[in-house]
């Protein structure tokens, strides 16, 4: 079995819960993608920081710390909340911080009603040479069994 990492960004705690359950369910290591400048509730307003970042394709919010041993992982699950039908721009920052050539990247997201939208289309340029699989959206009630069953369908 390949070595797996679950890396996630969570603004409200929902994605963190799903990421922890996923890592537990599949025996993966876990890493929280933390912004250098944490998001506040006010930053998530449609007229605030998150919208400004999401409106600028060149924006790359800084990450507080990198995962030192990323080379050890063959498969990286990347979790995030859906913002405006795509991944938050900080996910692009994370992916672009490493050479992911030859790795399998699997996005997963949390949302109260959105699907993955154009997530893969927006993430693909940030992980050249990696195999980017189509992801899935989960809600806060997703169990370890649900997550494990999803991973089984990926035939990793």
Where are these regions (language model features)?
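Redox-cofactor binding/interface segments in oxidoreductases and associated redox assembly factors
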Residues: 78-79, 107
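Glycine-centered flexibility sites
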Residues: 13, 79, 102, 112-117
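Short, conserved loop/helix-junction motifs that constitute active-site signature segments
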Residues: 96-102, 125-127
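N-terminal beta1-alpha1-beta2 submodule of the flavodoxin-like/Rossmannoid cofactor-binding fold
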Residues: 1-78, 85-87, 92-96, 145-156
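Short, glycine-/small-residue-rich phosphate/pyrophosphate-handling segment
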Residues: 106-143
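Acidic catalytic loop of the alpha/beta-hydrolase fold
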Residues: 84-85, 113
């Amino acid at each position: 079995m390949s070595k797996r990492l679950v890396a996630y960004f969570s603004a409200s705690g929902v994605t963190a819960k799903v990421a922890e359950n996923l890592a537990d369910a599949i025996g993966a290591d876990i890493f929280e993608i933390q912004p250098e400048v944490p998001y506040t509730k006010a930053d998530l307003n449609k007229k605030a920081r998150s919208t400004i970042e999401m409106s600028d394709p060149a924006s790359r919010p800084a990450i507080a710390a990198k995962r030192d041993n990323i080379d050890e992982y063959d498969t990286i699950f990347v979790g995030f909340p859906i913002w405006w039908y795509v991944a938050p721009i900080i996910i692009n920052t994370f992916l672009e911080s490493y050479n992911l050539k030859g790795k399998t990247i699997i996005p997963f997201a949390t949302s109260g009603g959105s699907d993955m939208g154009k997530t893969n289309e927006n993430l693909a340029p940030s992980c050249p040479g990696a195999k980017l699989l189509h992801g899935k959206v989960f809600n806060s009630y997703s169990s370890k069994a649900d997550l494990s069953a999803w991973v089984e369908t990926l035939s990793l």
